[in-house]
Amino acid sequence: MHIGVLALQGDYAEHANMLEANGAEVSEIRLPDQLDDVDGLIIPGGESTTIVQLIDIYGFRNKLVELASDGFPMWGTCAGMIVMANELTDHRPDPLKIMQIKVSRNAFGRQIDSFEENLKFKGIKEDFPAVFIRAPIVISTSDDVEILS
């Protein structure tokens, strides 16, 4: 499987390294036409306002929305999830509106309020050590969104 990692801003290198360590073929995606060569896309964490600005500057928005409507697999972590959301509680950034969720940015407060928590994930036997750093929280989902943890 060939996975693309949107490499405009944020922790794209960490995502790419982890995927490669687990046997995936990985490409860092910097231009919209590179999406034609991958089987799925990860939009990594980083700063959501900056990521959205770069998505628009580099002309990704229409391509990502089109791919999502065609069922192209995408995963967003932290800021990536914010970018994909249908609705935000904040007035910015303007998300892609490709995942039917409502998200509150920085819901866990300031940087000093960051914490770690072991989570149970559907399909994973062992608890997963999750780090919440000024993390967003999903306020609501549509009925067709599957909650994994």
Please describe what each predicted stretch is.
Residues 12, 35, 83, 90, ...:
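Flexible, glycine-rich phosphate/dinucleotide-binding loops
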Residues 1-69, 73, 122:
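N-terminal beta1-alpha1 cap of cysteine-dependent amidohydrolase-like domains
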Residues 7-9, 30-32, 100, 107, ...:
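Residues at the C-termini of beta-strands that transition into short coil/loop
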Residues 40, 72-73, 97, 129-131, ...:
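Structural motif
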Residues 105-149:
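Amide-donor transfer/coupling interface in amidating biosynthetic enzymes
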Residues 48-120:
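Cysteine-nucleophile active-site neighborhood
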Residues 5, 28, 76, 97-100, ...:
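Structural signal for conserved beta-strand scaffold positions within catalytic alpha/beta enzyme cores
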